[in-house]
């Protein structure tokens, strides 16, 4: 995206990069990433989604059901970055019917994570991939894998901020501290500007006493130092249906 001043000078406007992160699986990272991105696109923003999970959960939920058959994925682009090969504008980008773009992922990314361990500048390979795209989008959302490995560190190193979807369950609350320690370490050693957007409580069930207790525990334990969004994502059987349909909640159930 470009901003033109009165004198004719052009200033490149860089995208805001948000890593959707939690080392626990099944907390709604991919669903959050997809629907947040499409929601922003509906408001006129240009959005790129990046699947950084070798399982390809985001890629599959957006309608590409066989990610292992895709010729160009995030793994392809990161391999180019590691070997100092140029990445062409728009290379590997897929276009979704609901107005967002996607850099997909597949199982090849698992092998690349192992290769990153021995790579120079290993924490910043994803940042190199995204450097060109930052001028083309308003937002870049990174769907992170359920671990705190090198790919997640790459996402945090490239991001301006991180959004943490989190189930209202005891084990999720226990695992949050480990994630926050990783964020602090990345902030100290690699990306001092990294911020925490907040915790988004997902799969909530306000009908149960247990769900309410965990909700209160998270808000009381972390609410003073981290934003815990008032808006929560309730548990719904529709979530699986929406992912299978390859659509967002906006297209699947436009009447809400």
Regions found by a protein language model. Give the residues of each.
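P-loop NTP-binding core
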Residues: 1-256
